[in-house]
């Protein structure tokens, strides 16, 4: 992928990736299975159906810190304290259930319950009791007993164990947890899938197990915990199975028993207690089903032996049969005909058409027409429209096609039609069916008078319940207050999707009497705490014994009625009545006739049979944790692993199974998502396709475990291993952390110090102003003990900020000075320090590191004799006289153009300009001159003496001497930068008398140049230090680039557009641009090296190994090892430290202590790492001996310090590469044809056609068909090559742009959006080999859109910015893989990559201004820049995770900005994308008026890494 590389920093610093959110909002964990129910089919609660959703939609790379916060947030929602007066509508589900539980919530046992409890204490038991008879209390009693025993065992030192209360729906989780909390004094936790429990790790589970004695959860949660070895059977003391009749086939109840319970020794098994109203829920042999249930649960059915006592507690209702006349055949109403004629072709309305037609017979025309009113109501219409668009988008079409917009428009028209259609009168003939009329009649009789009747009407379909509710609302039966209770279903097409909260609120209203007639589906049959009714009506007849028993159990009120509605002369209905009655009698007889000891013959054999049926399924057990992998669970484990590879906006990371017939059997190949290190596996042959699929999944899981990509709990390690590597790049701090030794001066100055030099080497220094200077500056020659290199030119700023180029010319011939010559040279050099800089040194030529002398004025060349270059006349003049003494009879013109200085005050140095005949020494100074203490006369103004000395001098001085105009020399020494405003404001015009001052023997032109010498020698010294750094690394880099790479001119140099902190003036260019270039070359060089040295590695290993090489931590460690920190220039010009060291100072301020105090500098670790990359960039700009990248290659080897990259030249890459077998194999006809076609399009001829075949082979393509590797390795290489060619182009074209601008515009050139459009433009998309129907659809639609946009754009080269994003996992990768293939095929000629760039990419980017806004102003991008650049914080992340609706509503997504483990802000939305935007926007608002210091104080931001290790940290995927 182009810029989702593992080494690219995302918004995290423990930087985690910004993880995607599961689109599946249903509860539970996935077993890899699932089914789809049409919205108008039989009612089935979807509360636990979510357990069977594919978990590949789930994200499993959550940061541990965020996960804890997310869990806490969800728990807070569910368990938040309830205010006494808080409205019911504001309560959470737990609070609603807790507040409105029937009775007080304190249960008292009855005799038969105690009897069953005693039995359950000593043996595994299935309690078969009627609904309402108190099975839950027996479970509570048993739990109390088990907890008491457990506490005793723990006190005796036994390992702790806990109890599990397993239920089959999410609503029951809430309800049973509330009951247990009201009856147990121990901690009770409740969990279900939508709480994100499938994302928890062992540590999280261990914490819950440790602090809770009982856990109420849906069964699949425990099943997965057992399979993942988060808990073992030995750690469980009791398993309670609510509604135990579900234990059959592959239900999680059955899987827990088969996969975990029966596989441990009997002595280690927990007690089992099952509860059900009937042990069977299917048609067929009742006794056989009961025995099977006993075998599956390893338990014995038990019921009370005192049924008379039970009858006293559970009132059996009076059973009635309501007979209605035979229904009419289905027909079509007028509204139906009208709707069908105009909108019958809209597939989304098909369920409504089907139900409306069926309802004409079952319910009548009023109800049939009413479904349209409900389905197309104003409040439902937006949901319908969203469902249409969402369904189309879920098929991978991306943007909505025109036909979807058309359907939405027509749906609105249909709604308007229904609204305008005159409603029928429900009392009219044929308006209601005979069945509904009977219901109306009977209910009217029950509610016609003042009564306390409570009624539940059971229907099979959701629509039926809703329409009957609407009907009885319209009929306005006296005393009737109707309501509707249906199951949770997120995919209902007509907006009838209800939430857990709505369910609970409806039951609360029913309990309080606000509703007294519920029209309900099967959701009201089982488990829910619904108060006793005195009328239960089966509008749609039950079909199984369990439905009959459970719905009858709702009629528990005294003198209640249970009515079954049957059609007159309907043999099927009459048969069901007989069958259910017979089955109940048989079941009762079975229970009553069981022997007292409840021993069933053949139980052991039955248990063995359960295991024998899965004998082929030998589990793979991990010894360290006892986690088990079975063939059945392998599919779930594999799906969970695949989902851990998914990132935001990626296509779904799903597992692909390819089943092929082989020798009268089936063999399955499993193909893992593209990002998986292991591509897949092939299973053993099997006679059934489903078995072959399990075999392949099992082998793939074993292979993943072998490569340690599944941990010891069978969870993906990606959420730990990959982000740790992704974060390596940012695993060091950007801020000041340590003090490092700094090299104050080049070691060249110390060579041969202490001896009189026998030979010296000269370097001529001349100045070339860009505009004329106000005064002449003479040339100088610098003699040193060692030869100086050729220095680059550099600017200084003289006079009134005139930019002046410093030219240096090294003289090849050495100078062997005589003793006299050396004496003259020493005298002049020391005179400069005294007169110009007020430092008087002892005359010790053996200690001088250099000699600064005047040069002759004619141009000098390198071959000149240095003796001829020196102006010996000036040296002689200076040597002969200390100063030019002022004489009263001196001609005034001799005083002009002199350098004069105040011997007593170093602030006053002047260049004399002219004599003013109009002024006298006694005249007051002109008003424009700078203010001094004595302004009465010019003579007094010119003196710096003390009071007494001043009086003496004034009494004897010459008051008739001339007055001169002079230029005051600014104290400014840092001529490497322009003047500051303060310096510019200094008044330099002055008037002086000469007598109080000293006239230097140094000519004014030479003195002027000497004033610039501190800046010049400082810059030359910096170049020499850069040269030393390069020599230490074995590099030959241009001094200009070497110094630039080592220059850090502020504390936050890397923050390109932020205000620079502690800015050092005049240091020249800093390292930031070179670091940008070097970073890119480092990525390319290490990619090539790894590709060549490890041809068999997969893309994952390449990314991880490259990250280990190029991460800042590795660069930092390597730099510290080589002591590169001492060469970094972090300080600008110093007026105190430029003087030569070691000389004996006789007069003047001593700066030696200052030099000692600046022996160290504070550097951030990241700065040191950045300098390494900048040195690579500098080496890259220095031509190599054979290839222009040679020096860059050598620099990479020097800074990464690893055997993974030890190349010394570009040629070494070629010698490292061993051609793989597939590349050399003879191509077949299709491969030759592919090369020919691609050559016609792109112009490159492949020597190895199979390389091109590999470049166009998608990872989804089965290896059995491909015969070449997929493109991942070539794409890894091509991605780095493309980055390099784009960066190099921008770097050279825009020399003044900062790295942030370069990065933003490079993003356009290498973006998936552009590369996808380019692939289509070049026609590459037609050559891709893949095996994915989703990809086929995505490529087709994207190509059509891209081609249309290109054809309509005329000459606009940025047309691609207006298209949708391309399929990310193929088209952009194709371009990069093609570049990688060309590079390898051409024997590593980078020039071929440049040719492709010039021909096919650069034409789109000649005018980069077009893309100024491409890096859009996204809140998350801005937040990232603000935190890193403005605040300098690196320890932050943006995380998002799904949480269950606080009250069972649709799941929401919570995003949080975390700074140093503090939740800065959060955002909640329906999707991860918008939640992150909200959180980012809130964070930007929060930080709006906070400066850097306040931020660091408030969030304790120091960004200091406690250690450099990256352990098993679950950090996530960067922004």
Swiss-Prot record:
Keywords: Antiviral defense, Antiviral protein, ATP-binding, Helicase, Hydrolase, Magnesium, Manganese, Metal-binding, Nucleotide-binding, Repeat, RNA-binding, Zinc. Its EC number is 3.1.26.-, 3.6.4.-. Residues 116-297 form the Helicase ATP-binding domain. Residues 431-601 form the Helicase C-terminal domain. Residues 1-13 have a biased composition (Polar residues). The record marks 1368 as: Important for activity. Residues 1-62 are annotated as: Disordered. A motif (DEAH box) lies at residues 242-245. SMART domains: DEXDc, HELICc, RIBOc. The keyword Zinc-finger does not apply. Its cofactor is Mg(2+); Mn(2+). One of its GO terms (molecular function) is RNA binding. Residues 39-48 have a biased composition (Acidic residues). PROSITE patterns: DICER_DSRBF (PS51327), HELICASE_ATP_BIND_1 (PS51192), HELICASE_CTER (PS51194), PAZ (PS50821), RNASE_3_2 (PS50142). GO terms for cellular component: cytoplasm; nucleus. Mg(2+) binds at residues 1275, 1373, 1376. Zn(2+) binds at residues 1433, 1460, 1501, 1503. It is an enzyme of class 3 (hydrolase). Dicer-like endonuclease involved in cleaving double-stranded RNA in the RNA interference (RNAi) pathway. Produces 21 to 25 bp dsRNAs (siRNAs) which target the selective destruction of homologous RNAs leading to sequence-specific suppression of gene expression, called post-transcriptional gene silencing (PTGS). Part of a broad host defense response against viral infection and transposons. Belongs to the helicase family. Dicer subfamily. This is Dicer-like protein 1. It comes from Aspergillus terreus (strain NIH 2624 / FGSC A1156).
């Amino acid at each position: 992928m182009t810029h989702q590389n593992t080494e690219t920093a995302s918004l995290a610093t423990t930087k985690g990736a910004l993880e995607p959110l599961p689109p599946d909002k249903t509860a539970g964990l996935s077993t890899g299975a699932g089914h789809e129910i049409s919205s108008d089919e039989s009612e089935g609660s979807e509360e636990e159906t979510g357990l069977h959703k594919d978990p590949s939609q789930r994200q499993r790379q959550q940061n541990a810190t965020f996960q804890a916060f997310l869990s806490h947030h969800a728990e807070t929602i569910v368990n938040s304290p309830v205010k006494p007066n808080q409205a019911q509508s504001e309560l959470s589900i737990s609070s609603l259930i807790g507040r409105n539980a029937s009775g007080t919530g304190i249960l008292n046992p009855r005799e038969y319950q105690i009897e069953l409890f005693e039995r359950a204490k000593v043996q595994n038991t299935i309690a078969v009791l009627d609904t309402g008879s108190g099975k839950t209390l027996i479970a509570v009693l048993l739990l109390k007993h088990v907890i008491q025993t457990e506490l005793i065992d723990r006190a005796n030192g036994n390992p702790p164990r806990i109890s599990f209360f397993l239920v089959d729906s999410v609503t029951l989780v809430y309800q049973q947890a509330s009951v247990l909390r009201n009856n147990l004094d121990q901690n009770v936790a409740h969990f279900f899938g939508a709480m994100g429990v499938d994302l928890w790790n062992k540590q999280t589970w261990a914490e819950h197990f440790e602090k809770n004695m009982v856990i109420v959860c849906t069964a699949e949660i425990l099943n997965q915990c057992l399979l993942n070895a988060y808990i073992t059977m030995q750690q469980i003391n009791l398993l309670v199975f609510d509604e135990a009749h579900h234990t059959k086939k592959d239900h999680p109840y059955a899987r827990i028993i088969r996969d975990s319970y029966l596989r441990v020794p009997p002595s280690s098994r927990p007690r089992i207690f099952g509860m059900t109203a009937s042990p069977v829920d299917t048609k067929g042999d009742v006794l056989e089903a009961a025995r099977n249930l006993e075998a599956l649960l390893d338990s014995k059915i038990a019921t009370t032996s005192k049924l008379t006592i039970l009858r006293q507690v559970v009132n059996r209702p009076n059973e009635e049969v309501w007979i209605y006349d035979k229904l009419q055949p289905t027909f079509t109403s007028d509204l139906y005909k009208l709707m069908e004629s105009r909108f019958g072709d809209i597939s989304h309305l098909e369920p409504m058409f089907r139900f409306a037609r069926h309802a004409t017979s079952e319910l009548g025309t009023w109800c049939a027409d009413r479904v349209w009113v409900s389905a197309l109501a104003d409040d439902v219409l937006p949901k319908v429209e969203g469902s249409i668009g969402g369904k189309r988008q879920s098929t991978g079409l991306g943007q909505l096609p025109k036909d979807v917009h058309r359907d939405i428009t027509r749906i609105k028209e249909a709604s308007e039609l229904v609204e305008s259609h005159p409603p029928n009168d429900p009392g009219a003939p044929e308006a209601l069916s005979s069945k509904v009329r009977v219901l109306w009649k009977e209910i009217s009789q029950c509610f016609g008078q003042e009564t306390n009747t409570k009624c539940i009407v059971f229907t099979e379909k959701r629509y039926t319940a809703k329409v009957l509710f609407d009907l009885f609302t319209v009929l306005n039966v006296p005393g009737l207050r109707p309501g509707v209770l249906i199951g949770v279903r997120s995919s209902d097409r007509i907006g009838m999707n209800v939430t857990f909260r709505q369910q609970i609120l409806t039951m609360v209203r029913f309990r309080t009497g606000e509703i007294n007639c519920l029209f309900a589906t099967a959701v009201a049959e089982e488990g829910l705490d619904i108060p006793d009714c005195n009328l239960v009506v089966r509008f749609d007849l039950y079909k199984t014994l369990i439905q009959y028993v459970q719905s009858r159990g709702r009629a528990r009120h005294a003198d209640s009625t249970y009515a079954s509605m049957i059609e007159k002369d309907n043999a099927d209905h009459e048969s069901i009545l007989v069958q259910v009655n017979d089955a109940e009698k048989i079941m009762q007889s079975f229970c009553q006739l069981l022997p007292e000891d409840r021993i069933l013959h053949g139980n052991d054999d039955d248990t063995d049979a359960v295991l024998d049926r899965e004998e082929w399924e030998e589990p793979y057990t991990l010894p360290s944790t006892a986690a088990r992998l079975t063939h059945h669970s392998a599919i779930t484990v594999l799906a969970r692993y695949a989902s851990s590879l998914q990132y935001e906006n990626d296509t779904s990371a799903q597992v692909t199974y390819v089943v092929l017939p082989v020798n009268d059997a089936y063999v399955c190949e499993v193909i893992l998502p593209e990002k998986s290190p292991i591509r897949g596996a092939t299973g053993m042959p099997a006679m059934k396709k489903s078995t072959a699929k399990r075999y392949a999944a099992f082998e793939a899981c074993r292979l993943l475990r072998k490569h340690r990509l599944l941990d010891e709990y069978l969870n993906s390690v990606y959420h730990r291993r990959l982000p740790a590597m992704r974060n390596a790049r940012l695993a060091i701090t950007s801020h000041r952390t340590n003090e490092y030794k700094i090299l104050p001066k080049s070691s060249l100055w110390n060579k041969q110090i202490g001896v009189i030099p026998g030979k010296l080497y000269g370097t001529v220094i001349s100045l070339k102003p860009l505009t004329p200077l106000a005064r002449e500056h003479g040339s100088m020659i610098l003699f040193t003990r060692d030869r100086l290199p050729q220095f680059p030119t550099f600017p200084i700023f003289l006079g009134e900020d005139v930019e002046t180029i410093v030219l240096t010319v090294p003289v090849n011939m050495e100078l062997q000075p005589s003793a006299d010559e050396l004496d003259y040279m020493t005298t002049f050099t020391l005179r400069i320090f005294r007169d110009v800089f007020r430092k008087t040194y002892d005359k010790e030529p053996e200690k001088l590191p250099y000699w600064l002398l005047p040069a002759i004025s004619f141009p000098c060349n390198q071959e000149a004799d240095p003796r001829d270059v020196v102006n010996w006349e000036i040296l002689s003049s200076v040597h002969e006289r200390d100063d030019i003494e002022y004489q009263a009879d001196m001609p005034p013109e001799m005083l002009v153009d002199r350098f004069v200085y105040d011997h007593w005050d170093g602030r006053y140095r002047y260049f004399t300009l002219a004599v003013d005949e109009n002024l006298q020494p006694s005249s007051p100074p002109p008003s424009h001159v700078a203010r001094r203490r004595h302004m009465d006369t010019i003579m007094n103004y010119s003196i710096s003496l003390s009071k007494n000395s001043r009086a003496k001098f004034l009494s004897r001085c010459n008051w008739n001497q001339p007055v001169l105009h002079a230029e005051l020399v600014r104290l400014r020494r840092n001529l490497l930068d322009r003047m500051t405003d303060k310096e510019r404001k200094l008044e330099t015009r002055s008037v002086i008398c000469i007598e109080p001052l000293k006239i230097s023997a140094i000519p004014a032109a030479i003195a002027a140049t000497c004033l610039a010498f501190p800046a010049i020698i400082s810059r030359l010294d910096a170049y020499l230090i850069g040269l030393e750094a390069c020599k230490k690394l074995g590099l030959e880099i241009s001094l200009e680039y070497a110094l630039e790479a080592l220059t850090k001119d502020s504390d936050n140099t890397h923050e390109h557009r932020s205000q620079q902190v502690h800015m050092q003036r005049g240091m020249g260019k800093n390292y930031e641009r070179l670091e940008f270039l070097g970073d890119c070359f480092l990525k390319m060089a290490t990619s090539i090296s790894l590709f060549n040295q490890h041809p068999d590695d997969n893309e994952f290993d390449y990314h991880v190994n490259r990250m280990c090489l190029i991460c800042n931590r590795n660069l930092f460690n390597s730099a510290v090892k080589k002591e590169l920190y001492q060469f970094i220039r972090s300080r600008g010009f110093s007026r105190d430290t430029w003087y030569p060291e070691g000389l004996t100072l006789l007069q003047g301020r001593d700066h030696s202590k200052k030099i000692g105090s600046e022996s160290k500098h504070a550097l951030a670790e990241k700065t040191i790492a950045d300098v390494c990359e900048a040195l690579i960039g500098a080496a890259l700009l220095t031509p190599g001996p054979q290839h222009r990248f040679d020096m860059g290659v050598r620099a990479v080897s020097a800074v990464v310090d690893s055997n993974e990259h030890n190349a010394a030249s570009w040629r070494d890459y070629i010698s490292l590469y061993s051609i793989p077998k597939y590349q050399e194999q003879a191509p077949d006809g299709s491969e030759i044809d592919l090369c020919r076609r691609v050559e016609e399009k792109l112009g490159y001829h492949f020597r190895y056609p199979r390389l091109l075949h590999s470049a166009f082979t998608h990872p989804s393509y089965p290896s059995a068909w491909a015969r070449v590797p997929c493109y991942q390795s070539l794409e890894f290489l091509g991605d780095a090559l493309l980055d390099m060619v784009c960066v190099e182009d921008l770097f050279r074209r825009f020399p003044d742009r900062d790295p942030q601008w370069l990065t933003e515009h490079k993003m356009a050139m290498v973006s998936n959006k552009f590369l996808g459009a380019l692939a289509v433009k070049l026609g590459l998309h037609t050559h891709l080999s893949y095996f994915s129907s989703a990809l086929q659809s995505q490529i087709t639609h994207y190509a059509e859109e891209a081609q249309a946009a290109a054809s309509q754009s005329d000459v606009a080269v940025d047309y691609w910015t207006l298209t949708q994003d391309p399929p990310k996992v193929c088209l952009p990768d194709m371009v990069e893989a093609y570049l990688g293939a060309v590079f390898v095929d051409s024997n590593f000629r980078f020039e071929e990559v440049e040719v492709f760039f010039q021909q096919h990419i650069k034409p789109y980017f000649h005018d980069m201004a077009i893309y100024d806004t491409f890096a859009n102003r996204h809140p998350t991008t801005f937040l990232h820049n603000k935190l890193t650049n403005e605040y300098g914080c690196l320890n932050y992340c943006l995380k998002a995770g799904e949480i269950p609706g606080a009250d069972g509503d649709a799941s929401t997504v919570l995003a949080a900005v975390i700074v140093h483990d503090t939740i800065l802000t959060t955002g909640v939305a329906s999707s991860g994308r918008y939640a992150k935007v909200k959180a980012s926007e809130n964070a930007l608002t929060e930080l709006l008026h906070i400066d850097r210091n306040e931020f660091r104080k408030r969030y304790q931001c120091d960004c200091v890494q406690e250690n450099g290790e990256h352990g098993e940290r679950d950090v996530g995927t960067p922004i």
